């Protein structure tokens, strides 16, 4: 397929709103839950089956797989606990082996932040992987959990991806607010859009009532705080220190995370740390 050729998403209304997903697009869906992500993955899979194409599911999260192998789905397993470099190279090798014009669905980028204890490495993975997928004319979907990452990490992802789409849902409605759509434009493209279930269209919000209802939902689902100026690891340490000094709580699980991340994976060293270190010693090492 040619570069920037239109590709169907399985949702005609979405294709109309965005002037189509294009070959080479990395699409980041900023969502509140993985259920929101599946609203877009399931139609993509159905469209690819109709077109006789395969979908590669890049599975690396601890949760059950979003898609099962078979019927046009190939599942590729990866382990983030191997570390940033090994994980990134394994993903890159899989992409290289697949070649051009492939279609990918990735697990949640936020799970990489949890595995590596830092937004920085999650962002670095995306900044390395996204351009390679673009180079190979692939289409790739990535979910990102809203409010879980530093503003800097989200900005790095937005800078790199071709599309960044904010998704909001409640019991009645589904909305998309495009934050970035690269290399295409329409007068209404960057307005919030509501999905009309009967027609399948995504219509821009223009009436006062609908706009007010949308921003009320945004306010409800958006958890923005001053801590989002910090990397996730900095937030974790700050919250842990605050909890310890206020409530005297420093659990073995928290100690394991800090010692493994900052110190060593060697069991003998970890045993010595647990014997001789107090919580404030860990905080001092972090400084």
What are these regions (language model features)?
Residues 35-38, 49-52, 259-286:
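Helix-loop-beta substructure at the N-terminus of cytosolic sensory domains
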Residues 115-116, 121-148:
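Substrate-engagement module of ASCE P-loop NTPases
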Residues 2-4, 184-259, 263-267, 273:
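C-terminal regions of RecA-like/P-loop NTPase motor modules
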